[in-house]
């Protein structure tokens, strides 16, 4: 295992050029940031990354922004995923971190959706890691454990703070055995926090 540190631009309000310069200066391997939506913005980011010698982790959302459009179907989310994965290839990301689907879907729907999403990524030659996040598939540890068992090749990005918020506990009880999930974590989004404030801004 090799530890590489990427600076997250989640909530970063300044220009990307500043972020890239700061990341390089601080010794980060690269940045993790939302996929720019226009070709011009992607070209601009690509030039910044190349100029600073930084790697890139692309973040994309299916079916809208952080909170998905509640009216979109799994099929529409899959079409959106495919379109954005094609666009992300322009930046040659190390991998793509995907906030996928909708937590309102049943476990069966989430399994089917994530299986199809995994196949879309495989066909396109994209390495994808699916993030644990409220309002999305993988919003709870219990659904995620079932998905991990049934989709043995699916990789995960963990921001465990979302589960701590949703479950109202640290998930450190022996009964909270997350081993099947932990063994498949590809990417960790670390946060500073405490038991009643796991998402300190």
Predicted segments, located by residue:
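Hydrophobic faces of well-ordered beta-strands that scaffold small-molecule active sites
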Residues: 1-8, 31-33, 56-61, 94-98, ...
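N-terminal pre-domain/capping segments
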Residues: 1-83, 89
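Glycine-enriched alpha-helix->loop->beta-strand junction motifs that scaffold or abut catalytic
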Residues: 27-29, 52-54, 92, 150-155, ...
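Short amphipathic alpha-helices and their capping/turn segments at secondary-structure boundaries
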Residues: 40-52, 82-89, 142-149, 172-183
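Active-site acidic/histidine proton-transfer and metal-coordination neighborhood
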Residues: 70-156
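Acidic/histidine-rich catalytic cores of soluble enzymes
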Residues: 123-201
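Glycine/Thr-rich phosphate-binding loops of Rossmann-like dinucleotide-binding domains
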Residues: 41, 106, 198
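Active-site beta-loop-alpha junctions enriched in small/polar residues
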Residues: 6-12, 34-36, 61-65, 101-103, ...
């Amino acid at each position: 295992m090799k530890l590489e540190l990427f600076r997250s631009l989640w909530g970063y309000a300044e220009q990307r050029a500043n972020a890239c310069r700061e990341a390089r200066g601080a010794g980060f391997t690269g940045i993790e940031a939302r996929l720019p939506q226009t070709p011009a913005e992607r070209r601009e980011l690509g030039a910044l990354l190349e100029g600073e010698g930084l790697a890139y982790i692309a973040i994309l959302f299916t079916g809208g922004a952080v909170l998905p459009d509640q009216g979109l179907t799994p099929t529409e989310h899959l079409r959106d995923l495919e379109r954005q994965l094609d666009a992300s290839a322009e930046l040659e990301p190390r991998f793509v971190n995907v906030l996928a689907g909708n937590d309102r879907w049943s476990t069966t729907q989430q399994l089917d959706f994530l299986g199809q999403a995994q196949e879309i990524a495989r066909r396109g030659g994209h390495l994808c890691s699916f993030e644990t996040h409220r309002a999305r598939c993988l919003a709870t540890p219990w659904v995620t454990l079932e998905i991990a068992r049934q989709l043995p090749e699916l990789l995960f990005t963990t921001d465990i703070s979302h589960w701590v918020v949703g479950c109202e506990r640290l998930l450190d009880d022996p009964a909270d055995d997350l081993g099947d999930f932990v063994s498949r974590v590809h990417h960790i989004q670390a946060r500073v926090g405490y038991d009643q404030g796991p998402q300190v801004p």
